[in-house]
A protein has these predicted regions:
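Carbohydrate-active catalytic/glycan-binding domains of CAZyme proteins
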Residues: 1-130
Length: 131
């Protein structure tokens, strides 16, 4: 079972996605475009940037809702799939958190984190299983 989200190390910078000043400028501009888009959902969990689809773990724990979902945090394309993570006290106001799971070179999930689920384990921690 994967480690609880708050115990995960920061996401590594992938060799194919260097954090160059140009990349940061494009990501910042992209956030402004999304913020001002009249068609962007206002009452729907949405990451600040990147691709989102397939909620794979929605649970209530500790007085909050926790949502895990397929997410490409670096581009708006269906690739480089991570598990994004958001939480909410009321299913209307969402807090975005660091990715809960990310692909790692040399492992079975190197091609992406796809389907799975989240559960509250016997020790009270949030656990995730994925394929």
């Amino acid at each position: 079972m994967a480690a609880p989200a708050d115990r995960l190390p920061p996401a590594p910078v992938d060799r194919d996605w260097p954090m160059t000043p140009g990349y940061v400028a494009r990501a910042t501009a992209g956030r402004a475009i999304l913020r001002d888009d009249p068609h962007r959902p206002r009452y729907h969990a949405c990451p600040p940037v990147g691709w989102m689809n397939d909620p794979n773990g929605v649970i209530q724990h500790g007085g909050r809702w926790h949502l895990f979902y397929q997410h490409n945090p670096r581009a708006s394309v269906h690739a480089d799939m991570h598990w994004g993570y958001m939480s909410s006290p009321d299913l209307v106001h969402w807090d975005d958190h660091a990715c809960a799971l990310r692909p790692e070179d040399g492992t079975y999930d190197a091609q992406g984190i796809w389907s799975g689920n989240a559960v509250v384990a016997d020790d009270g921690e949030i656990g995730r299983a994925h394929v």
